[in-house]
């Protein structure tokens, strides 16, 4: 019981920092992981090979800069701040620098696998977040709950139990993977990246509540610190929220449309890496909702 309470207090402080910095809560995990698998299936074999050979790195890349949120989540710091900041900035400078990192690497295939996963994350975020922001405005439902409900929707669609599915099993928080990833970010060491990846697994484990006992402990701790309304949406609910049914259907359409966008962008980025051509203009937007979300019609 004490272990669960301590774990929740860690999450709560970290989540508050996410809310104040980014205006969002911690991101979905299954949706991004599933999206990457779907993009892989439509890519040409010659491009897909690098990702499949280095699947752990591709899978981590699918979570983009979000992995940095989990670095000492309770305390504001430069590492987590870099992750938050990247969501507000245009993405093209990051991907231009990434090309330089790849060009200077001894094992370029590993670097490419990671960054191709990162591209998938960027595309799904930038396609869906404007609509999620509009959903929040219209319904008052939190960002975290909408994304949690979409995770539930996809897990159920895939025949998986949303309550028992462990969402970070594909995250390999190894020193070797951290060594590949660190150079893509500003002034981060491999130890910091590995700590962030381990933090990601720890945070998700703390909020994993397949049974009533753990669920009651987590929700009870939220109520004790008066944060239930803000954070209960981070825990997979026992039943679907009917208010999110239509939102999930819309997000599913956006998701399906984004698969071809991501595959096309991966191929164009590979051309950018290997040939003398311009960085695709699709990178000139943020990971977030952007400035025109209020004009959207749901």
Language-model features, listed with the residues they occupy:
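N-terminal leader/auxiliary helical segments
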Residues: 11-115, 123-298
């Amino acid at each position: 019981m004490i272990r669960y309470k301590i774990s929740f207090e860690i999450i709560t402080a970290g989540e508050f920092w996410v809310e104040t910095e980014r205006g969002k809560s911690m991101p979905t995990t299954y949706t991004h992981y599933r999206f990457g698998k779907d993009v892989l299936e439509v890519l040409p074999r010659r491009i897909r090979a690098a990702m499949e050979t280095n699947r752990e790195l591709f899978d981590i890349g699918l979570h983009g800069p979000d992995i940095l949120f989990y670095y000492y989540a309770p305390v504001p710091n430069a590492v987590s701040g870099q992750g938050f900041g990247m969501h507000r900035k245009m993405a093209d400078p990051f991907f231009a620098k990434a090309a330089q990192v790849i060009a200077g690497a001894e094992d370029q295939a590993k670097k490419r696998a990671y960054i191709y996963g990162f591209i998938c994350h960027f595309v799904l975020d930038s396609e869906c977040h404007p609509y999620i922001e509009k959903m929040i405005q219209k319904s008052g439902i939190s960002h975290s709950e909408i994304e949690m409900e979409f995770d539930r929707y996809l897990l159920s669609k895939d025949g998986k139990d949303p309550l028992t599915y462990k969402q970070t099993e594909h995250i390999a928080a190894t020193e070797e993977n951290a060594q590949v990833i660190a150079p893509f970010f500003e002034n981060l060491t491999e130890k910091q990246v590995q700590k962030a990846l381990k933090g990601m697994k720890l945070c998700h484990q703390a909020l994993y509540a397949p049974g009533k006992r753990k669920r009651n402990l987590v929700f009870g701790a939220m109520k004790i610190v008066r944060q239930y309304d803000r954070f209960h949406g981070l825990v997979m609910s026992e039943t679907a929220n009917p208010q999110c049914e239509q939102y999930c259907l819309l997000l599913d359409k956006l998701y399906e449309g984004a698969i071809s966008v991501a595959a096309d962008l991966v191929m164009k980025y590979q051309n950018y890496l290997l040939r003398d051509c311009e960085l695709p203009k699709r990178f000139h937007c943020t990971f977030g909702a952007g400035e025109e979300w209020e004009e959207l019609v749901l």
